[in-house]
A protein has these predicted regions:
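Conserved SAM-binding loop and adjacent beta-strand
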Residues: 38-53
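N-terminal auxiliary segments of SAM/dcSAM-dependent transferases
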Residues: 1-22, 239-287
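Conserved class I S-adenosyl-L-methionine
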Residues: 64-73
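Class I SAM-dependent methyltransferase SAM/SAH-binding core
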Residues: 74-125
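Conserved beta-strand signature within the Rossmann-like core of class I S-adenosyl-L-methionine
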Residues: 162-172
Length: 288
């Protein structure tokens, strides 16, 4: 299916598999690993202009010391955004459900001399991040195939956000009819703005980003949710990583991550922290 240019998620849905959408996304994206870097390199001018706009959105949010992309993939967009941020010393993080994509992303960032950025595996239904620990949490077209899970995703991403949650995703309600047909077919997320308001969140921006792109299948929009922008104190030298099961702090010990509260160990493979809930190993005597 992948070699013929087909949509793997659509294929898995059509064969009536019992797998959930997160498993389908994992399989699909793992097959695609490496392809996004090639695409970005072929379209470097487009990527540059697009990320200029994204970086401007973040820079206009005021002071922040940490930023994280959920569904970071191979880091192609991430690697173009972080160097354009006003804070050159910002702590930057990214996670993705696919180990293979993170592996490619790690190599990609190394080539960009972004060794200080940390990439790891994780999913946004059980983020391996502590509460209120990252100033700006953002997504770029990573939530889109998770239609029906909007409330669950928003609640979890809001939990880990310290100042702003920025969702750069196709917005069904503001899109063209052509786009809506495409989004309905592929089960895209809907009603993000409405659900955010129902959850009591403060939405400060809600619009289509590229008006000249209204006839495309994916009308990229932005939803900005302000959580607590007035926080001035920094979380200096404090890792935001947390156990995806308990949300409590993880510490690096014997080259792996361990949660002393839950007694769960998470392996680091090829310098990639594997922080999916299913990666957890019960290790009650890890410090012995």
């Amino acid at each position: 299916v992948f070699d013929s240019g087909g949509n793997i998620i659509e294929y898995l849905k059509n064969i009536n598999t019992n797998q959930g959408i997160d498993d389908m996304v994992l399989i699909s994206y793992d097959f695609q690993a490496g392809s996004y870097i090639k695409k970005a390199e072929k379209n470097s001018e487009y990527e540059g202009k697009r990320t200029d706009i994204y970086a401007e959105i973040f820079n206009n949010l005021g002071d922040f010391d940490s930023i994280m992309e959920v569904g970071v993939g191979e880091g192609t967009t991430f690697s173009n955004i972080v160097p354009k941020l006003n804070n050159r010393n910002v702590a930057s993080f990214g996670f993705d459900i696919s180990y293979s994509r993170i592996q490619y992303g790690q190599k990609h960032l190394k080539g960009k001399k972004m060794d200080s950025s940390l990439l790891f595996t994780g999913n946004f239904f059980n983020c391996p991040i502590q509460n209120d620990s990252v100033d700006i949490v953002y997504s770029i077209h990573s939530l889109e195939p998770n239609g029906g899970k909007e409330k669950e995703i928003l609640t979890e991403l809001y939990r880990i956000t310290r100042k702003y949650l920025v969702l750069i995703e196709p917005i069904y309600e503001l899109s063209s009819e052509q786009s809506k047909v495409h989004m309905d077919k592929h089960g895209y997320v809907k009603n993000i703005y409405k659900i955010a308001l129902e959850l009591g969140y403060k939405v400060t921006d809600y619009r289509i980003l590229f008006e000249d792109n209204l006839q495309s299948d994916n009308n990229t929009g932005v939803v900005i949710i302000e959580k607590n922008s007035k926080i001035l104190s920094k979380r200096e030298n404090i890792s935001p990583l947390g156990c995806p099961v308990t949300k409590l702090p993880l510490s690096l010990h014997k080259e792996h991550y361990y949660c002393k509260d839950s007694l769960l160990l998470y392996p680091v493979i090829n310098k990639i922290p594997c922080l999916l809930p299913e990666n957890a190993i019960v290790a009650t005597h890890f410090f012995d």
